[in-house]
Design a protein with these regions (language model features):
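Short, structured beta-strand/loop micro-motifs enriched in basic residues and often containing a Trp
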Residues: 222-232
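Polysaccharide-binding surfaces and accessory modules of carbohydrate-active proteins
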Residues: 1-219, 234-236
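Short Pro-Gly-centered flexible turn/kink motifs
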Residues: 238-250
Length: 250
């Protein structure tokens, strides 16, 4: 199965990409209520990699270059008539990339989403091969209302984010905040640092509502996704009538 993946690396370092021993991370993560629960002993821990994700097909891509930014729009579709749009914007004056994910129901029946990622990154670290033990550090910020963020750094192995001997069971760390307090327990931020190659991938969510970040690993590659808190974590779902469209917050 062909999978469209977003792989971000520092400028000029693409020649050092070595990863070919892990599954590609789909560009968009989504789950519908009619989907079966995730496999690989991961039920109740994650809603990623649903049957819906496995049926997504590439439907085209455009790139527009402006004076101040580059906008790359990628289209995906699935057999139920859902059309997904992933918009990646790279700004000339900002080192951060912006991702916007939306879905439109082009079919004749209503469908209910119970998870939709705002962004997802995978194959971390693309500069490593094999398990690469003790080289991935996870950075999070613990905080609450009217408090300073406290940096917590843990090895991926300390969070049980390492594959089994057969790379079958999937492990996940899902965290965030439920309710209108965007910071209650954690700041909507997470970073994965490759200490062997001096590269860090960091992401932040921006909505003032329930949110989540999720670290996921089944094989040698680590994935990081985030956005709206899903149905399991934040009791969220969204029904799309025929012709309706929904855009996940940044």
């Amino acid at each position: 199965r062909d999978v469209v993946e977003l792989l971000l690396v520092p400028a000029g370092s693409d020649g050092g990409i070595a990863r070919s021993d892990c599954a590609a991370e789909p560009l968009i993560q989504a789950k519908l209520t009619e989907d079966d629960a995730p496999a690989f002993f991961s039920g109740g821990r994650t809603m990623r990699n649903s049957p819906t994700v496995k049926t997504m097909q590439y439907a085209g891509q455009t790139a527009q270059v402006f004076d101040d930014k580059i906008v790359i729009v990628t289209k995906l579709t699935d057999p139920r008539g859902l059309a997904y749009t992933h918009t990646l914007t790279l700004y000339a004056d900002n080192p951060a990339a912006e991702v916007v994910t939306s879905v439109e129901n082009t079919g004749s029946e209503a469908h209910t989403l119970e998870m939709l990622s705002s962004f997802t990154l995978g194959s971390l670290s693309p500069f490593s091969e094999g398990l690469a033990p003790e080289t991935l550090k996870i950075h999070r910020l613990r905080s609450t209302w009217s408090a300073e963020g406290r940096l917590v750094t843990e090895a991926a192995e300390d969070l049980q984010l390492e594959p089994s001997w057969k790379c079958y069971s999937a492990n996940s760390v899902r965290f965030g905040s439920v309710g209108s307090f965007p910071v209650r327990g954690f700041v909507p931020f997470c970073a994965v640092e490759d200490t062997a190659h001096g590269v860090t991938w960091a992401a932040a969510a921006t909505q003032g509502s329930s949110w989540q970040m999720e670290l996921y690993r089944q094989d040698f590659g680590l994935s990081l996704s985030g956005g709206l808190a899903d149905r399991e974590f934040g009791a969220w779902c969204k029904t799309l009538a025929p012709g309706a469209c929904f855009t996940a917050p940044k």
